[in-house]
């Protein structure tokens, strides 16, 4: 597993590194406005893609057991059902995308609307639909513990085509060709996935029989997917509507950095997730809860580390990377840091929940979506971008840090609300002590004179190392953290 994590980490860093250059040249040669439009398209398509309804997660979960038991008949039935689902979804997505085309000007605060935007939109739509060519293979290989193969194919294809896109941006300055490269990338991935499938999965056969178990989980996961869309894919649309498309482009540059951090987190999660499903199916609640606490305390550590370093370093990074005129104010960055923290610490709870097959808590995503949308719109009208981000924070605290953990503790671990208060109360104390100590210790090292990459690298290394060491010392107050150190560090010595 360590090898898989390291390989995944290297690929993630490489993709992100190329992505930073890609974003910089995009702004320089094509413009911040087109970048904003592109990011807006991505969020629109996420909403239209709601018709996917969480089939991917439900299908992966459904395949774990038959693959482990070598029940190839059941695997064939489930895969046939997946293919049927996604063929229908592709057609529905195309029709919805065409119907949504006339509404594009309503969401874009532009001085003039260029008709080429409609063409860009249709191509972006086709790009999303083309991913359904190979989605069943991704689901199958992931459930069969072949995630690293999926990662290889997707990563190397993306890296090659990212480089092509940068060349096109600089030499031709064409957004149209930029999108066509995305389509070609998906086609190449499909070919490689298809080859691997034909060589290694000859035991899977075509069948008209359908797996009915997916319907229940899909209905429940639909609400989780809808809530995720509203929480994670509303900000840019609201910023475009209430602020400007240029601010969308600027905020998207910050999001690119946050996405890199999220990808680093997902590197670990993507390797753990399939193994977690098997562990839960073979162990009792107490063992599962013990594992949850061990992993969760590590992600609390990472959440504070990432969010504090991001708050301290991101504006200087943006200034050196694309220019000081694209920097957001410090309070906005503070709010971004809070969201990053919650986004990091939530992933373990969500993964234990999904691996346990706990999908029927539809009240959680509905509540989260309503709170997020209402507060984001209300505060967005009053406070602009800061209000929109605050709306997301309010829903995250209410549902993700309070309501949902209580449900998971009860359903997945057989623990009551007192145990939740005890554990999360301890986390809150650790957070408060950590921030207090970090504010004191890092204060003498804060700089305002970052003018080059060398300056930033030295500054970032200093802040990151100090933050990591301070957090390590503070987290020794936690029993679960101490046990991890004893078992995985001291025993090896």
Mark where each language-model region is:
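Membrane-interface junctions at transmembrane-helix termini in multi-pass inner-membrane proteins
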Residues: 2, 128-156, 176, 201, ...
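Helix-loop junctions and terminal segments of transmembrane helices
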Residues: 53-69, 142-143, 201-202, 254, ...
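Membrane-proximal transmembrane or re-entrant/amphipathic helices at the cytosolic face
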Residues: 413-417, 438-493
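Interfacial/gating helices of multi-pass transporter permease domains
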Residues: 26-47, 78, 175, 213-217, ...
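Membrane-interface helix-loop junctions in multi-pass transport and translocation proteins
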Residues: 27-34, 145-148, 159-190, 360, ...
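Alpha-helical transmembrane segments of multi-pass membrane transport and lipid-handling proteins
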Residues: 81-110, 163-170, 191, 289-343, ...
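Signature of the first transmembrane helix
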Residues: 1-64, 94-98, 102, 127, ...
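Interhelical loop/hinge segments that connect adjacent transmembrane helices in multipass membrane
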Residues: 1, 116, 176-178, 191-233, ...
